[in-house]
Curated annotation (Swiss-Prot):
Entry's localization field: Cytoplasm
Cysteines joined through disulfide linkages: none
Name this protein carries in UniProt: Uroporphyrinogen decarboxylase
Species annotation: Listeria monocytogenes serotype 4b (strain CLIP80459)
GO CC terms, sorted: cytosol
Source taxon at top rank: Bacteria
Length: 353
């Protein structure tokens, strides 16, 4: 395995002292990069993610181009679902479309056992290739969290209100629990397999869970998240686990009492406020990605965020959501350099090391 010479991200995830703030970006690989767009002229998303050499190249591009302190595996949260019998298609301009949506207990019962080594060997081969030969920064693996996956599976695709998902959850609580159990087991096995293959950390993306109240989260979702984290930690107790959601600040107190290591927040929550709600966790975030299209505002906001981030150990600079396709790659490089240089000055000034 290639030696990790830049471990700033891992130190921050463990709330250790650093000399500068680590930075990486959700969706840093892919859509905004001309090299990726050129690949997409020849290959589909399916073809890219199923060819380890190409997928590893795409994953590594931001490390080489922007100088970020971590790589995140290039793939989709839908990747494992076909291994459970879900007929999913990624449609351009729409997103994931499920051709056999969940409507009943019988549909949930049909979901099959997921074995990563059998169903997604190309994912594990990509990780091994990156970890063994290509990266000197940590590699982050990830999975979609059960609520977000279930919302696609029940709605049949993207949704603005998740009415079908929530009504199914309320109307069929026992069937919902079975669905969560199946998705939870799949997610735990998937994350464990990624760590076994060489990832240094893993992130749970629960993109749409902010649609739930805290009470509903505690009743319908928390048990499965606890199970996932518990099972991963039982095998890999020192591997950082990140929880990332959007519009979910009201759930921070739930995550504080779980054995998570890092909590991602978006621009609706300040770093200072988040720290008060999750004092034992490292914080990741929280620049609004829209500012990347307004350079002056972007750097101003980045400085404001850093002023809060450097006050305590355990901070990782990121966005509150993913990079837009319209973002110029040079802006991400400029921002990365700014974060590194500015945070080093601030840390020396405040003598926080």
């Amino acid at each position: 395995m290639t030696k990790i010479t830049n471990d700033l991200f891992l130190k921050a995830a463990r709330k250790e002292q650093v000399d500068r703030i680590p930075v990486w970006y959700m969706r840093q690989a892919g859509r905004s990069q001309p090299e990726y767009r050129k690949l997409k002229e020849k290959y589909s998303l399916f073809e890219i993610t199923h060819q380890p050499e190409i997928c590893a190249y795409v994953t590594k591009l931001p490390v080489d181009q922007y100088g970020v302190d971590a790589a995140i595996l290039y793939k989709d949260i839908m990747t494992p679902l076909p291994g459970m019998g879900v007929d999913v298609e990624i449609k351009s301009g729409i997103g994931p479309v499920i051709h056999n949506p969940i409507r009943s207990f019988q549909d949930v019962e049909k979901l099959t056992m997921f074995k990563p080594e059998i169903e997604v060997p190309y994912v594990l081969d990509t990780i091994k290739l990156l970890a063994d030969d290509m990266l000197d920064v940590p590699l982050i693996g990830f999975a979609g969290a059960p609520f977000t996956l279930a919302s696609y599976m029940i709605e049949g695709g993207p949704s603005k209100n998740y009415h079908q998902t929530k009504s199914f959850m309320y109307r069929e609580p026992e069937v919902w629990a079975i669905l969560m159990e199946k998705l939870g087991r799949m997610t735990a096995n998937y994350l464990i397999a990624q760590i076994n293959a060489g990832t240094s950390a893993v992130q749970l993306f629960d993109s749409w869970v902010g649609a739930l109240s805290r009470a509903d989260y505690a009743e319908y979702i928390r048990p499965v998240i606890e199970m996932i984290v518990r099972e991963v930690k039982a095998v890999h107790p020192t591997t950082p686990i990140i929880m990332q959601a959007v519009g979910a600040s009201h759930l921070l107190a739930e995550w504080e009492t779980m054995p998570l290591d890092v909590v991602g927040v978006d621009w609706r929550e300040t770093i200072t406020s988040a720290r008060k709600k999750v004092p034992t966790k490292a914080i990741q975030g929280n620049l609004d990605p829209s500012t990347l299209l307004a350079p002056e505002k972007c750097l101003k906001e980045a400085n404001r965020i850093l002023q809060e981030g450097v006050l305590e150990p355990g901070y990782i600079f990121n966005l509150g959501h993913g990079v837009f396709p319209e973002v110029p790659p040079e802006m991400l490089k400029k921002l990365t350099n700014y974060i590194h240089e500015r945070s080093e000055i601030l840390l020396k000034k405040d003598d926080i090391k």
